Structures are given as structure tokens and as C-alpha cells.
Amino acid sequence: AMGSEPTAAATGAVGVLRRDPMAMKPFCGYHYGDYFRHWLSFDRPGAKLPKIFHVNWFRKDGNGRFLWPGYGENLRVLEWMIARAQGTVPGRETPVGILPGAGELRLDGLDLGRAALDELLAVDPAGWQAEIAAIGEYLEGYAPRLPPALHAEQQRVAAALNPPPLQAAAG
């Protein structure tokens, strides 16, 4: 459930996250629960599903500066996406999906410090727990027509972000 802040071209309060980043919700001709079910129906044996990637080009550091330079440098990330879709790079499994693994992004000639790269590729459990909770609230708005698979995936990610504490060995 992607989210975005409204831009000057969109209606709504600036700085408030909306779960309608493509601004299509008002134009969907049927219930979103049914719409989600329709998309999930494509996942069957032998199906060649599209590869879907999510990118936040606008992440900022603690000083409010963009972590990624953007513009033409975005091609470096697109190259990784293509390599990932073709199966030539494995990526790194995380609770929220597959991220570029060490050395998989072409960084030659890029003025990007190691700390910025580490922050870009980090999964902040607390931040993601809040995001997953917000997604859960969003999805509940489509109950009872929400496909169970979407709720199950939201719960799977939530559990992966909050692993149980390690138990001390008895001895």
C-alpha cells in the first residue's frame, strides 16, 4: 500500500501521507477490495507476473538532506532492478522485500559516502513497524471484502519486523 504526500497539484493537506499515490482512487469503478482480489487472481501456476519495485527517492538524513543524489543517478538503481528481474543479482532478503546486496549497485564516480549508502539500504524496524501498522489500518477500511491474502501478507511482514526475543538456554 504505497503512500505519498500530496503535491501542489493535488488536493489535501501538504505533508499528510495519503494511501493513493497514483491518485486513482476516485476513478476506480468498483470496490477496492474487489480490485485487489482481481489483481491477486493473476497469481497462478505458470503465470509470468510483473516485477514490482518500490523506491523512495526522497529519503533524507538527520539534517534534512536527501540521501540519494537523484536525477540521472537514478539509472544506477534502475540498472539494479533490471539485473534483479533478469536474475543476475540475488539482492538481500529483508522483512520488507529484497534490497540491493553488497556491491550490487554500480557506485563508481558517485559522491555518496558509506554512511549514506548504509542508511539508504537499512531497514529501520521501528519505522517499518509504524508503516506496517498504518497499512493495516488502511486495509481494514476495505473489510469485509479485503482478500485474506493481503491481510496475511501485512501480518507476515509485521511479525518479521518484530521477531520474538531470544530465549536463554537452560543450563
Whereabouts are the PLM-identified features?
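Conserved NTP phosphate-binding and transfer environment spanning the P-loop NTPase/kinase superfamily
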Residues: 1-169
